Amino acid sequence: PSTGEAALLVEQTGFTSQQSRDRIRMVIAAVQNLPGVTVITHEAYTPEEVDFLWSLPERVVPLLMRLPGPTHPLPFVEDVAVPPEALHDFLVRAQNVFKKHEVTSSLYAHAAAGQLHMRPFLTHPTSADAQRLENIARDLYQVVFSVGGTISGEHGDGLSRTSFLRSQYGSLYTVFKQIKQIFDPHNLMNPGKIISDDPHLTIKNLRPRVVPSAELPPPLMNWSWDRISDEAARCNGCGACRTQDEDQRMCPLFRTTHLEEASPRAKANLMRHIAAGNLDHELMASEEFKRVADLCFNCKQCEKECPTNVNIP
């Protein structure tokens, strides 16, 4: 229902369909007796219904990224995991962290594993307010550590979490450094990741917010330069649109040509630089610009499969 505060998908298996039904109804009976909450349940047993319900979590990020407004759910603390028995305490304390910093955060999770994806709603940061992101991460991770959790439960540590690994692993971090020195003494492999003395690595490589140049001509169609800038800003340059995986469909033209300019992110970068005034807007009337623009036939597979659902067409 639209008034619901949360939803939880629970799957039970059995050797027979009746055994699965009995187990599901035991779960329902248990949660309906919880004090102080109203629980509405829906049972699904056909393959079509089950597949539909399990498809719902896949729609969370696309829906979040398409929400209108100046703020966006930024994925910089989205991979924490805590012991399942500590979930209740952690969620209360995590909400207090967001209240302290006056932000709202989305939340979806793999509850049985204690895996939480939190995305605070913030504007794309400028160099002046980037410190806010680091402060939110630091305060939230302190809560994670205090309940025996990890800041990287499902994905890699990467640049955004490297600065906090020393706090998570303590003296064991020295062993990480020794291993790095043995196998990569010249720091050639993924420099700056996992092993780094930079305390501000989380915000060091942020892509700044683009403010459209005042010299841009007014668009002739029903769009604005602010809208173009916001859409281009959704691209973080991860390169997922260059995938060759057989279970994905983006980007057909890049798969055929293997040219960077054919990739969706190339168009986002091009429009970002034009909007910012780094490139002359008259470039859009050139043959070179048309050649890049023509490397898209509006199939919208990038919008469907991009991690941040950038609508390149």
Describe the function of each predicted region.
Residues P1, H42-E58, Y108-F121, G153-L165, ...:
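A glycine-rich phosphate-binding loop feature that marks nucleotide/adenosyl-phosphate handling sites
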Residues L201, L206-C238, R242-P313:
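Ferredoxin-type iron-sulfur electron-transfer modules in oxidoreductases and energy-metabolism complexes
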Residues P84-A94, H101-R161, V175-I179, E231, ...:
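Extended, hydrophobic alpha-helical segments in both membrane/secreted and soluble proteins
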Residues P1-T71, A109-A111, I195, T256-M271, ...:
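Terminal amphipathic helices with adjacent charged low-complexity linkers/tails
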Residues L63-L67, T71, Q168-W225, A233:
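Activity-critical C-terminal alpha-helical subdomain
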